[in-house]
């Protein structure tokens, strides 16, 4: 599998966190809460062996931030 993509995007009534591989999205009242949830999700997935990337989009549509969470390296 490749990198799991997680997006934080503005909505009319809050901020959404969505993933390419999941149909349902989560909605938060603030961008900060959505970003925090997305980063925690990405870290959990990475710890489970699924590298993830979070992309945070601003209200105007511009990319506001990009974060990578890599899977831990296997010990030799």
Region spans (language model):
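Conserved short hydrophobic patches within well-ordered secondary structure
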Residues: 8, 17, 28, 42, ...
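Short aromatic-glycine-(Arg/Gly/Cys) micro-motifs in beta-strand/loop hairpins
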Residues: 1-25
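A short, polar/proline- and glycine-enriched secondary-structure boundary/capping micro-motif
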Residues: 27-30, 76
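A short, charged, amphipathic alpha-helix used as a generic interaction element across diverse proteins
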Residues: 29-51
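Short, mixed-charge low-complexity intrinsically disordered segments
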Residues: 46-76
């Amino acid at each position: 599998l490749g990198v799991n993509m997680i997006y934080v995007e503005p909505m009319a009534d809050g901020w959404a966190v969505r993933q390419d591989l999941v149909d349902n999205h989560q909605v938060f009242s603030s961008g900060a809460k959505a970003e925090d949830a997305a980063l925690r999700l990405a870290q959990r997935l990475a710890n489970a062996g699924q590298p993830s990337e979070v992309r945070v989009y601003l209200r105007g549509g511009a990319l506001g931030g990009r974060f990578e969470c890599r899977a831990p390296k296997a010990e030799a």
